[in-house]
Amino acid sequence: MGGKNKQRTKGNLRPSNSGRAAELLAKEQGTVPGFIGFGTSQSDLGYVPAIQGAEEIDSLVDSDFRMVLRKLSKKDVTTKLKAMQEFGTMCTERDTETVKGVLPYWPRIFCKISLDHDRRVREATQQAFEKLILKVKKQLAPYLKSLMGYWLMAQCDTYTPAAFAAKDAFEAAFPPSKQPEAIAFCKDEITSVLQDHLIKETPDTLSDPQTVPEEEREAKFYRVVTCSLLALKRLLCLLPDNELDSLEEKFKSLLSQNKFWKYGKHSVPQIRSAYFELVSALCQRIPQLMKEEASKVSPSVLLSIDDSDPIVCPALWEAVLYTLTTIEDCWLHVNAKKSVFPKLSTVIREGGRGLATVIYPYLLPFISKLPQSITNPKLDFFKNFLTSLVAGLSTERTKTSSLESSAVISAFFECLRFIMQQNLGEEEIEQMLVNDQLIPFIDAVLKDPGLQHGQLFNHLAETLSSWEAKADTEKDEKTAHNLENVLIHFWERLSEICVAKISEPEADVESVLGVSNLLQVLQKPKSSLKSSKKKNGKVRFADEILESNKENEKCVSSEGEKIEGWELTTEPSLTHNSSGLLSPLRKKPLEDLVCKLADISINYVNERKSEQHLRFLSTLLDSFSSSRVFKMLLGDEKQSIVQAKPLEIAKLVQKNPAVQFLYQKLIGWLNEDQRKDFGFLVDILYSALRCCDNDMERKKVLDDLTKVDLKWNSLLKIIEKACPSSDKHALVTPWLKGDILGEKLVNLADCLCNEDLESRVSSESHFSERWTLLSLVLSQHVKNDYLIGDVYVERIIVRLHETLFKTKKLSEAESSDSSVSFICDVAYNYFSSAKGCLLMPSSEDLLLTLFQLCAQSKEKTHLPDFLICKLKNTWLSGVNLLVHQTDSSYKESTFLHLSALWLKNQVQASSLDINSLQVLLSAVDDLLNTLLESEDSYLMGVYIGSVMPNDSEWEKMRQSLPMQWLHRPLLEGRLSLNYECFKTDFKEQDIKTLPSHLCTSALLSKMVLIALRKETVLENNELEKIIAELLYSLQWCEELDNPPIFLIGFCEILQKMNITYDNLRVLGNTSGLLQLLFNRSREHGTLWSLIIAKLILSRSISSDEVKPHYKRKESFFPLTEGNLHTIQSLCPFLSKEEKKEFSAQCIPALLGWTKKDLCSTNGGFGHLAIFNSCLQTKSIDDGELLHGILKIIISWKKEHEDIFLFSCNLSEASPEVLGVNIEIIRFLSLFLKYCSSPLAESEWDFIMCSMLAWLETTSENQALYSIPLVQLFACVSCDLACDLSAFFDSTTLDTIGNLPVNLISEWKEFFSQGIHSLLLPILVTVTGENKDVSETSFQNAMLKPMCETLTYISKEQLLSHKLPARLVADQKTNLPEYLQTLLNTLAPLLLFRARPVQIAVYHMLYKLMPELPQYDQDNLKSYGDEEEEPALSPPAALMSLLSIQEDLLENVLGCIPVGQIVTIKPLSEDFCYVLGYLLTWKLILTFFKAASSQLRALYSMYLRKTKSLNKLLYHLFRLMPENPTYAETAVEVPNKDPKTFFTEELQLSIRETTMLPYHIPHLACSVYHMTLKDLPAMVRLWWNSSEKRVFNIVDRFTSKYVSSVLSFQEISSVQTSTQLFNGMTVKARATTREVMATYTIEDIVIELIIQLPSNYPLGSIIVESGKRVGVAVQQWRNWMLQLSTYLTHQNGSIMEGLALWKNNVDKRFEGVEDCMICFSVIHGFNYSLPKKACRTCKKKFHSACLYKWFTSSNKSTCPLCRETFF
């Protein structure tokens, strides 16, 4: 290729990748050419001949393997890596015979690629090798010798993953037992390869200098050398002993090479490390050979002792020790005092240079191997050695690292013990070790807190213990005596430095702490040693352990080597002090020292009140609490105890110095108020108690102290100290369980609760410690038992519960947060800690109260959020404890039983608002989730059963639900009623309290959802009942026509908590639930029937599941209310056949009823209602059947006319009669819709006369509209009138033929007039009585059908109205009174709160608007020139209304920036304001369009002055959507333009509400469209004067959505125009928004192009002309300007503008004669007119023609008259 991002090189048609090239070559030729690197036999593995000469060999290698092997010879790392991975995969996947063919070629490749520079390649090579081994197994044996050297090197690779991969391959080939044999088999070849690498190879021989960079060559060489050295070591370790002799010669030759010994000084640390490892291995495995090379080994190793590289150091020191062990005369070849020791001293003085953990463990073995000859004089040598060693502790690195300092300290004590052991009896050395080393070292440590850790003191204790043990057991008296002297001397010196530290008046804190820690360790060395979590390697001296069998020693890896004469092991803790008793050699001096220090300390406390010495004394007494020490502390002071103490206490004081000290000193210190931290004083108390003889004495002392002497904080501290320590707890157990402390704590609880509630003073410092004390005694347990007696625990909990119970009843002003908070803390700790203790009865009462506080809203409890959170955590911890008690059950648990009853009462009897219910459900959620963890599987089911109401309780709650839900089903005809079950009370009900049925169903549904996670079994169909009741609640909410906000919130809460039918139905039995619903529907009807319809409609249940329940149609008869409602709800989902079956059951029943039966449910009313329900879905298409029923109804009128409520007073009508009338009217409406057969004249008369009579009844009974059935009667009456109006409005010539003669004229002249003469006054009356009632309210239900009917009113009927006169004083108008009355009556209704009224009024006024401008036209002359800018107002009624609306919209939209879209909630108050405003503007614009151009100018000036149009435009850009596209256009054909609110006409429907959310946006777009179309100049003026941001928003929106529509309409008007121009043709191009006019005069063509801008009509229209013909420049410009101005600023159309322009041109050329020379009006070249006139004949000629005539004829005469021209 031509490189990255370049074109392929010309002619380079084959792939550039080497792998792909090889693959292509193999495909073309069938073989791969031979290449260097593979041998033809086992003896010669270096060369592979060309394949053409060795087909028989190459045929053994698979072609895919050939390809991969070829890739492996490439230099590219990626190619090699992928090839090796591919090779490994192929080895795994191919059969063994195929893979075996690769073996002859593998060794050469492996040997080369295993040394590759890239570590990934090396790792992949070893991984592939392992796969090859696993496949070929023993077949690899012939090739081992060629491989083994490099294989061993690979196992020592410096890249660990590669080394591990090589070891894995080696282990896959050879089990551990066979590995030595394999190495022995190849030992000569291995040695040869490794020696060559070490002696012969160089960077340039290993890598090609021509192609490999120097840095890479050197790196590879260093790695190869390192691996070779390590491989030699591995060879030595793996080889059996009997094979070593055969390699001596080869190793001799290696060791004879100076190059080998130079590796010890190599600059690369990895090489030096590998070198020293090899030296160690050689010393161990071939010691004789190393002895021979002593002169080279010794300097090479010992003189490198100061090498501080972390890589080299471990191997170096290992080599040092092996050298000292193997070569006895090594010191002959180096100068120890001048060369080795100074280097060693420097290293250890510097703390090992950061390698103390590596170097210092080797120091003891090192000095143990030093011959005496080179350490003389011993005193100086050991003194310098130890001094240097201690100096290492002073380095920064050692101070900051605990591991480093531990290593130094450990080495110091090991060496000190060794030197002491070796030189015992030599006083100078003994003195030096104690006086100059050990004591100064301890003194330095006591001063430095950084060194005061357990390791140092443990080592000291261990050293002393070993000396003491040896002195006790040593048989040699001299040695024992020497050791005793050393110990005596040590204790004397130690006593001196300790006394000196404590005797300082201002004792150093660190020193005092150090002394106390030291004494503790010396007192209890074993226990302190146990505190050390990590076991450290210790040195065990030869005389302390049995000699190990040296013959079994074997060379292992460098970690944990065993070397002759010394051994690293883990020493057990003090063997001789296992009993815990101190040696007499330590006990007496230690006690003497303690007494001295105690005496010094108490003196400082008494004299100077030294806090520091008192703390030290506390620590001292903790370890040394004896009568002797307490006597020392009392000194010579006499007993001064108060005589009022009981006799028993007085005796104890006399007998026991510790008790005397307690009363005499300690109590006074404890009661000092200024002391904040007194925990150490309590420790002294415990030390004194230890000196009592028995528990009874201790209890007596503590009881006495509890009564009077001890404060609450002291008691708290005593108990706190007892909890974590079993020793201390054992001392005070009788006192804790006793009556004295128990009663005091109960009194404390009582005091705290009362004081906190009454005083209302929450002082944390005063109460917190006491509350903590209560919490402690309730929550702490020892061996699953309370600290104090159970009876006192019970009494304390009872007191806390009583306090909480009071809090629950307090008002907000009385509540006390602090008491609740403290009780929460106490209770939480109590519940959380009582894991092994059973809850007490009182604690369950407390738990219930906590739960109740959490399950109630903040408005009731008046508790802040933080306390509610605390309460929740507290009661949850209690419930969690309760359910995990093994023997807990529902019956035994007071809490579970009472909480269930309380929950049941809360939802049934209590008044809950949304917030309260949400809090309750949340608490129940927490409770039940905790109960789920119980092992009792029935617990949850029983709990839910306890909350579940019985059937009568459910029924009572259902009946208590308000009945307003019936409004919608009645209006929509889904249910029918013939009795008055309620009267609608429109007064505001409680707007917060939720009905109990809703709360109960929500609670139980939530409980069921949680319970069934664990497959809890509910009895007695409780699950189905709960789901049914939830569905009842949800359906009740859904059916409310205008649900209050709190009910909407209730439904939202259920959704958030996933309490939905979909979530519940998967848990229960659907068939069982459906059976339950059908049973209830058949029994009760109403909502139960609607629930079934809802489930079917939402596809929650299928029709197949429902069918079995209505299969027997006859079972629903005789009709009851339940059966009727069930059938009505099922009707929408029944098939035609099923509906016919039900209808067949009803039709016979409609015949022959008495008046009473006609109105009953099982009579005419019920059966007609079922028939109507079936007819609603147009499933009955039998015209004869419909006619038959109509005739039956007509017969009813004849037989029982008084049943028909014609023009009567409904207050006297019964609900049954109202019900049957409603069903008759409904049937007639449905009959009109679905009956296609013609009606007889008498039938038409019955329908229309009945309709008008029912409307009269409606009109006469407006006062009874509050009665639901009357309201429903009014609705269906108006519906029938509306349906009739729609029927006659939609009649065509075809349908008129089927109607009786004169029916249309009768309708128009009588019935239609009668309808509107009744409904128009009703509209005025109803809207006048109720100003602020929304259309969704039941009271305004009849507005929809009434208003829809009024939209059919004709203009003539409007103008002939009989409304009372309504005129406004000072209202300027040219309209006649009847018209002004109509405007003044209807226009204000555009502000009415109901949308149907607004739309109906709009439709009526819209019909009047075109008639109004003519009245202003008649009075146009009165608007003369007396005004500078004459203006005329549109109809005053509309403008006054507009003024009100502008103020309302300013409140709604004024604060919203222009361009920010406002979403108006449908049917809200703001919705009605905006709707009325926009409808008003549509009327004004309609009025404006109907006016003449003169009037439009006057109206425009008025709108400009009032700035109403500007306000409108600002509001429109807050209401129009950013994307005014119809949602359904997304799925339409993409090539078509999308439908927008500007392309689609707005249908202002009263009944259709599905598009309500888009109503305002669409209407706003419609108004904007009209404004741009009818008032473009005014919009353009506003746009140009607006600020830049608004300017851009308007421009962008108009260009994108409106301009194209208006441009298309303008262009289309040109294309469809019938106007014809003589001599001018007009063409329009819609795509380019251009209109081209072509004006033709003779042979001359003039083109005029008018182009509309992209933001039309905001931008200027461009007028272009190609040629100027026969007109002066200025005149031509004037014409163009006139046309442009007319189109842009005068709201003119394009056709009108073109007519204007043509008129100008025609006038210019009108009457112009032809030039008598060229016989044309316009000159053919310069387009001029004939202007030069002859003075004689007056004929005019073109100047150019005349000039040509003069020049060609050589005469200056007129061409026509031949007279001289000039």
Swiss-Prot record:
Pathway(s) this gene product operates in, as recorded in its UniProt entry? Protein modification; protein ubiquitination
The answer to whether UniProt assigns keyword Metal-binding to this entry is yes
Per UniProt, the enzyme's principal EC class comes to transferase
Asked if the Swiss-Prot or TrEMBL record annotates the protein with the keyword Cytoplasm, the reply is yes
Give one Pfam family.
Ltn1_1st
Q: Could you list the residue ranges that cross the membrane?
A: none
Task: Determine the domain of life of the protein's source.
Answer: Eukaryota
Please describe the post-translational modifications of this protein. Autoubiquitinated.
Sorted keywords for this record are:
Cytoplasm, Metal-binding, Repeat, Transferase, Ubl conjugation, Ubl conjugation pathway, Zinc, Zinc-finger
| EC number(s) recorded for this UniProt protein | 2.3.2.27
Q: Which reaction does it catalyse?
A: S-ubiquitinyl-[E2 ubiquitin-conjugating enzyme]-L-cysteine + [acceptor protein]-L-lysine = [E2 ubiquitin-conjugating enzyme]-L-cysteine + N(6)-ubiquitinyl-[acceptor protein]-L-lysine
Q: What's a Gene Ontology MF term here?
A: zinc ion binding
The record's subcellular locations are:
Cytoplasm, Cytosol
Biological process (GO) annotations held by this record are: protein autoubiquitination; rescue of stalled ribosome; ribosome-associated ubiquitin-dependent protein catabolic process
Stretches forming HEAT repeats: 59-96, 100-138, 273-314, 335-372, 380-418, 433-473, 513-551, 611-658, 676-714, 768-810, 911-949, 1068-1105, 1184-1227, 1314-1352, 1377-1414, 1475-1512
Q: Which InterPro entries match?
A: ARM-like, ARM-type_fold, LTN1/Rkr1, LTN1_E3_ligase_6th, LTN1_HEAT_5th, Ltn1_N, LTN1_UBC, RING-CH-C4HC3_LTN1
Zn finger (RING-type) ranges are 1715-1762
Q: Which GO terms describe its cellular component?
A: cytosol; cytosolic ribosome; RQC complex
**What is the similarity comment for this entry?**
Belongs to the LTN1 family.
- Indicate the quaternary assembly: Component of the ribosome quality control complex (RQC), composed of the E3 ubiquitin ligase LTN1, TCF25 and NEMF associated with the 60S ribosomal subunit. The complex probably also contains VCP/p97 and its ubiquitin-binding cofactors.
Q: What exactly does this protein do? A: E3 ubiquitin-protein ligase component of the ribosome quality control complex (RQC), a ribosome-associated complex that mediates ubiquitination and extraction of incompletely synthesized nascent chains for proteasomal degradation. Within the RQC complex, LTN1 is recruited to stalled 60S ribosomal subunits by NEMF and mediates ubiquitination of stalled nascent chains. Ubiquitination leads to VCP/p97 recruitment for extraction and degradation of the incomplete translation product.
Q: Which PANTHER family match?
A: E3 UBIQUITIN-PROTEIN LIGASE LISTERIN, ZINC FINGER PROTEIN 294
This one is known as E3 ubiquitin-protein ligase listerin
Gene name as annotated: LTN1
